[in-house]
C-alpha cells in the first residue's frame, strides 16, 4: 500500500489558484476528484495529519499513489470540470447520486410518433418526459385510469400497438373511449400529440383551465338538451377533480421549487427532495450514500454543493425542455444551508435552466414548514436504513470471517468472483462471471463469455469451459497488470482490473481442479479457488479428496450460495437470450440473397414468422423488394417438407 509521503507534492509547487484535482491509484485509475478555491491549501490539508482525516478520506489517501491538478479561472469552471470528471471516471471514493431505479415514475415518450403514457422504473432517457417519482406503481395506474377519461392518450406497448394496427381493430380502451385509438386512424399524429401535450400540461400544474373548460362544455350540452353527453362530461369533470385532489396545494402562489434536506451520521447521508411544481408536490426522491468529507469543508455545506452539482447536472443533460414547467431545474432551490460558493452555484444552475435560479434557505411560513417535513422524511429514512445496515453489515462480516476461518485464508475475501456455464445439450454454450464486494453484488463488473474452444457443434465440456473462462479472465488481468500501455490516459478501469480474493466455480472436484490448474499455469498464486457443488452444497478445495462441509445454517454457506445462484441466474439469462435470437432468426437467415432490411420488411408486413409461413408466393411478392424467386426461396426455407413453395 503506498505511503502518502512518497507522492506528496512539494507545497511550493502547488498553485494557489482555484482548480480541480485527481487522486490516482498505483494502476493509474482515478479514485477521487475534488475542487478547491485554493489548490495549495486544499491539497496540503490531505497530507498534514493523515491520522485525523475522516476514515473514508484516510483510506483514499493511503490507497492513492499520485495526485495531479488542473488550474481554472473561476469557481464556476471548477464546478463544471469536477462534475464532468466525476461523471467520466466514476471514482470509487466520490459520492454518486445515481438515478433511483426503485421508485416508479409516470413516463411520456414524447420522442415517438404516437407518444405513450406508461409506468416506468429505470435510468432516465432522452426524449421521455417524467412525472414523479411516486411511492407506488398503483398510484400511477390510478392516476392514468382517471385522466385517460379526459385525455385519451395511448398507453399500450409497441407490440400491442403494431398488432392492432395490423388487424385494424382497436383494443378495449379504444372501445370504451379511454384511448383515442391512433392505431386504427381515429386520430392522426398531430391530434394525438395535442392530447398528450394537454395531459402533460395538466400534470405540470395547469389544472384550472381544463376543469373550467369541462364545466363550460357540460353546461352547453345541458342547454342543448344533450343530457347523455352532459353526463359523460360530468363524469370526466369528477375524474379530473379526483386527480387534482391527489396532489395537495402546498404553496398558493404557484411556486416551482425543489426542497432538499439531509440527515447523516458518521458513515452515511440520507437525502430527500420534494419536487414542487405549480404549487403542488409532484414527486419525491431519496438516496442513501456514503459520507465523504474533504479536509477543511463544513459537513452540510459540502453535501449541499455536491448534491446540487451532480443531481441537476445529470437532470439537465437527460431531459428535453419542451416548456417552462418541464424544466428539470426549478426557479427556486430550497436547501438547509448555503455553501460558501452559493453565488457560483446559483449562476451555474441559472445557466443550466436558461433563466435565473434562486438558491435559498427557507426561514418562515409555508416553505419553512415544508422544509421541516422533508427533513423529517430524511431522518426517518436514515433511521430505517441504519437498522437494516446494522443487521446486514453484521451478517456479511460474519460470513466473510467464517469463510476466511474455514478455508484458512490470509484475509477475508472482500472480492469474490464466481463462474458458471449454461447450455442445452451442447448448444449456445455460455459462461458468466459475477462479482461480490463486501458481500454485496457489484453488477457493473459482471461479464458474459461465449465459449469458443470447449464447445460447439452440439458438444459441451463443462470442465474445459470452466478452464477457458478462467484463462480468459486472468489473462486479461495479467495484461492490465503488466502492460501500462493498456491503461487509458484518463485512468478508466479495465474490464478485469481487480483480481478476486476468492474465485468460486459452480461444480465439484473436476471443475475446481481445472480452474486451479489454469491459475498455476499463469503463475497466479494469490487467488484462492473453491468449487460449490449443487447436490449436497459441498465446498471443494483444489486437489483434495474430500470436500469441506460447512454448517447448513452458517452465514458463510448462505453467502456462497447467493454468489453461486447469482452466477447461475446471470448465465441462464444470457443463454436464453442467445438461444432466442438463434431460433427466431435462423429460418430467414438461410435464404440466399435476403438481407436484414428485407427480412425486417417481411416480418413487419406479416406480423410473425408463422403468418409468413402460411402465406402464398403471390402474397409475399406484394412486399416491396421481394420477387418471385425470393418468395419461393423464403417458403422453401420455412416449409422444407411442403410442395406449395414450388407450385
Swiss-Prot record:
SUPFAM superfamilies listed in its UniProt record: C-terminal UvrC-binding domain of UvrB, GIY-YIG endonuclease, RuvA domain 2-like
Keyword terms: Cytoplasm, DNA damage, DNA excision, DNA repair, Excision nuclease, SOS response
Record domain GIY-YIG: where: 16-95
Subcellular location: Cytoplasm
Coiled-coil segments: none
One protein family per Pfam: UvrC_RNaseH_dom
Keyword DNA damage: yes
GO biological process, one term: nucleotide-excision repair
Gene Ontology CC entries for this record: cytoplasm; excinuclease repair complex
GO molecular function: DNA binding; excinuclease ABC activity
Domain called UVR: residue spans: 208-243
InterPro entries assigned: GIY-YIG_endonuc, GIY-YIG_endonuc_sf, GIY-YIG_UvrC_Cho, Hlx-hairpin-Hlx_DNA-bd_motif, RuvA_2-like, UVR_dom, UVR_dom_sf, UvrABC_protein_C
Function: The UvrABC repair system catalyzes the recognition and processing of DNA lesions. UvrC both incises the 5' and 3' sides of the lesion. The N-terminal half is responsible for the 3' incision and the C-terminal half is responsible for the 5' incision.
Protein family (similarity comment): Belongs to the UvrC family.
Oligomer and partners: Interacts with UvrB in an incision complex.
Name of this chain's protein: UvrABC system protein C
Species of provenance: Mycobacterium leprae (strain TN)
Amino acid at each position: 500500500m503506498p505511503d502518502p509521503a512518497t507522492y506528496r507534492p512539494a507545497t511550493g509547487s502547488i498553485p494557489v489558484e482555484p482548480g480541480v484535482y485527481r487522486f490516482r491509484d498505483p494502476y493509474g485509475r482515478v479514485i477521487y476528484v475534488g475542487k478547491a478555491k485554493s489548490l495549495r491549501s486544499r491539497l496540503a490539508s490531505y497530507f498534514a495529519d493523515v491520522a485525523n482525516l475522516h476514515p473514508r478520506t484516510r483510506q483514499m489517501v493511503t490507497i492513492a499513489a499520485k495526485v495531479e491538478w488542473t488550474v481554472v479561472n473561476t469557481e464556476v469552471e471548477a464546478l463544471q470540470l469536477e462534475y464532468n470528471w466525476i461523471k467520466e471516471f466514476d471514482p470509487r471514493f466520490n459520492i454518486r447520486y445515481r438515478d433511483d431505479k426503485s421508485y416508479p415514475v409516470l413516463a411520456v415518450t414524447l420522442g415517438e410518433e404516437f407518444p405513450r403514457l406508461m409506468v416506468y422504473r429505470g435510468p432516465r432517457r432522452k426524449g421521455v418526459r417524467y412525472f414523479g417519482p411516486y411511492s407506488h406503481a398503483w398510484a400511477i395506474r390510478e392516476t392514468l385510469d382517471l385522466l385517460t377519461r379526459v385525455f385519451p392518450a395511448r398507453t399500450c406497448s409497441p407490440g400491442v400497438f403494431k398488432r392492432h394496427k395490423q388487424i385494424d381493430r382497436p383494443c378495449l380502451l379504444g372501445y370504451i373511449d379511454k384511448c383515442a385509438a391512433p392505431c386504427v386512424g381515429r386520430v392522426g399524429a398531430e391530434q394525438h400529440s395535442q392530447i398528450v401535450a394537454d395531459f402533460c400540461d395538466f400534470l405540470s400544474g395547469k389544472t384550472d383551465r381544463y376543469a373550467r373548460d369541462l364545466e363550460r362544455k357540460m353546461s352547453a350540452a345541458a342547454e342543448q338538451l344533450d343530457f347523455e353527453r352532459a353526463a359523460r362530461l360530468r363524469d370526466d369533470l369528477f375524474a379530473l377533480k379526483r386527480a387534482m385532489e391527489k396532489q395537495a396545494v402546498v404553496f398558493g402562489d404557484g411556486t416551482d421549487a425543489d426542497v432538499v434536506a439531509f440527515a447523516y451520521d458518521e458513515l452515511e447521508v440520507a437525502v430527500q427532495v420534494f419536487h414542487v411544481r405549480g404549487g403542488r408536490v409532484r414527486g419525491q426522491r431519496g438516496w442513501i450514500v456514503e459520507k465523504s468529507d474533504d479536509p477543511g469543508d463544513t459537513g452540510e455545506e459540502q453535501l449541499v454543493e455536491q448534491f446540487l452539482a451532480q443531481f441537476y447536472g445529470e437532470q439537465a443533460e437527460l431531459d428535453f425542455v419542451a416548456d417552462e414547467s418541464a424544466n428539470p431545474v426549478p426557479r427556486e432551490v430550497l436547501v438547509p444551508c448555503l455553501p460558501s460558493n452559493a453565488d457560483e452555484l446559483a449562476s451555474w444552475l441559472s445557466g443550466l435552466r436558461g433563466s435565473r435560479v434562486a438558491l435559498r434557505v427557507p426561514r418562515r411560513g409555508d416553505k419553512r414548514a415544508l422544509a421541516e417535513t422533508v427533513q423529517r422524511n430524511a431522518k426517518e429514512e436514515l433511521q430505517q436504513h441504519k437498522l437494516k445496515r446494522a443487521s446486514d453489515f453484521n451478517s456479511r462480516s460474519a460470513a466473510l470471517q467464517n469463510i476466511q476461518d474455514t478455508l484458512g485464508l490470509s484475509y477475508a475475501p472482500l472480492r469474490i468472483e464466481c463462474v458458471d456455464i449454461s447450455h442445452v445439450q451442447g448448444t449456445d454454450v455460455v459462461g458468466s462471471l459475477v462479482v461480490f464486494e463486501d458481500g454485496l453484488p457489484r453488477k457493473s463488473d459482471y461479464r458474459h463469455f461465449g465459449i469458443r474452444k470447449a464447445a460447439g457443434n452440439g458438444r459441451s465440456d463443462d470442465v474445459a469451459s470452466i478452464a477457458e473462462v478462467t484463462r480468459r479472465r486472468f489473462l486479461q488481468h495479467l495484461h492490465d497488470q503488466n502492460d501500462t500501455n493498456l491503461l487509458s490516459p484518463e485512468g478508466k478501469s479495465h474490464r478485469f482490473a481487480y483480481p478476486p480474493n476468492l474465485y468460486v466455480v459452480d461444480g465439484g472436484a473436476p471443475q475446481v481442479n481445472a480452474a486451479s490448474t489454469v491459475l498455476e499455469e499463469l503463475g497466479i498464486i494469490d487467488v484462492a479457488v473453491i468449487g460449490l457443488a449443487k447436490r449436497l452444497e459441498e465446498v471443494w478445495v483444489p486437489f483434495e479428496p474430500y470436500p469441506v462441509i460447512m454448517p447448513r445454517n452458517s452465514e458463510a454457506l448462505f453467502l456462497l450460495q447467493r454468489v453461486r445462484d447469482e452466477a447461475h441466474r446471470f448465465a441462464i439469462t444470457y443463454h436464453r437470450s442467445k438461444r432466442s435470437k438463434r431460433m427466431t432468426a435462423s429460418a430467414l437467415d438461410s435464404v440466399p440473397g435476403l438481407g436484414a432490411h428485407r427480412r425486417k420488411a417481411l416480418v413487419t408486413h406479416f406480423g410473425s414468422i408463422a403468418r409468413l409461413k402460411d402465406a402464398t408466393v403471390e402474397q409475399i411478392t406484394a412486399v416491396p423488394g421481394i420477387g418471385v424467386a425470393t418468395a419461393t426461396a423464403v417458403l422453401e426455407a420455412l416449409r422444407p417438407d411442403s410442395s406449395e413453395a414450388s407450385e
